[in-house]
């Protein structure tokens, strides 16, 4: 993949990630002045995950690092705009949720229930379930660590 096609793919990925970030921010009643920042943070998070995955990271670690980035930027923006960090961060990480892995695991469970046990369906179910669970765990831990680091009351040592 050439650099120009990668930049276009990255721009497309970031633009398409900003749309659900704004949509979920509207569902969560985020103030209108913060919607553009939710879109930008969602685009930054999803774009950074895409860059890391194309650099060779697996999706779980790339999601964890992208969530760390989103959490850190959200805390900084909350100080600038005098708002809670969750206003920016929660809607921004939703585009990174593992919809395809969770859906495939659910469909595999339904097929096992309907057609009976088969080894390949069980492998598909477990691998996709563990992948989706790991991504959700990476999102939640990565989003909470910057707050634990930056709002710490006691000295680090």
UniProtKB/Swiss-Prot annotation:
Membrane topology: Multi-pass membrane protein
Keyword annotations of the record: Cell inner membrane, Cell membrane, Membrane, Transmembrane, Transmembrane helix, Transport
Spans traversing the lipid bilayer: 2-22, 55-75, 87-107, 129-149
Record's subcellular location: Cell inner membrane
Disulfide bridge partners, by residue number: none
Domain of life: Bacteria
A GO BP annotation: succinate transport
Record-linked InterPro entries: ThrE_2, ThrE_Dicarb/AminoAcid_Exp, YjjB
Chief place of localization: membrane
GO cellular component: plasma membrane
Function per UniProt: Involved in succinate export with YjjP. Both proteins are required for export.
Subunit and interaction comment: The transporter is composed of YjjB and YjjP.
Annotated family: Belongs to the ThrE exporter (TC 2.A.79) family.
Identification of the protein by name: Probable succinate transporter subunit YjjB
Lineage: Bacteria, Pseudomonadati, Pseudomonadota, Gammaproteobacteria, Enterobacterales
